[in-house]
Amino acid sequence: MIRIASLLLGAALLCAQGAFARRVVSGQKVCFADVKHPCYKMAYFHELSSRVSFQEARLACESEGGVLLSLENEAEQKLIESMLQNLTKPGTGISDGDFWIGLLRSGDGQTSGACPDLYQWSDGSSSQFRNWYTDEPSCGSEKCVVMYHQPTANPGLGGPYLYQWNDDRCNMKHNYICKYEPEIHPTEPAEKPYLTNQPEETHENVVVTEAGIIPNLIYVIIPTIPLLLLILVALGTCCFQMLHKSKGRSKTSPNQSTLWISKSTRKESGMEV
């Protein structure tokens, strides 16, 4: 019984640890509780031979109901950066490797003035947000766009080659990032969250749930109190009976206690043999 309880407690701790220590995993779709946020997937390939071209990345995302990443604003750019940072934490084995995003150039604009204006999002987004690296886009034969991810490379004129954008030839092989519509799952109504800006609420109204091991142990211990009392009563009864028997054995007959046998020879006076 004790072993089963230990296993259950260990499983609960592992689940809690998994909930608070979640990290981005390559190839895993990441969604958020807020249904307004899209879902994303970082497709990273450790082997260079497994990386794909722009068109292959685009088709891979579309085959799963998504699109190659479009970025609407700086906030979304920062979100992707934080996800890539979690993806490349020490010990994951993930290092350098740029990521295709869904920006590409239409037309054959060769002049530096017209070239940046010819880039459009492949999913039809009208976002004008750009995060080009210094002196990019270089145009020419480079029409598709990657997000730099080269943490071990020496910094260039624009700083580290991290998260800024660079145009590249569309047949080059890179990783890619997919973007999906928010996933909506039917759930039971959750408890109403408290609002910190309501002055009429007291601190007692803020606490709506209990968490941790101690509150859970209380719910386990309370039902066992009657059983513990029963065990204590049984032990007390057994001890009383054993003590009563031991006292009975220690008492002996008064006649037996006065009997003894002398080992010395008694000499009778006045008797001759």
Swiss-Prot record:
Glycosylated residues in this chain: 86
Positions of transmembrane segments: 217-237
Chain segments carrying region Disordered: 247-273
Residue numbers on the Extracellular membrane side: 22-216
Membrane topology: Single-pass type I membrane protein
An example molecular function term from Gene Ontology annotations: carbohydrate binding
Complex formation: Interacts with RABGGTB.
Name of this chain's protein: Chondrolectin
Biological source species: Mus musculus
This protein's encoding gene: Chodl
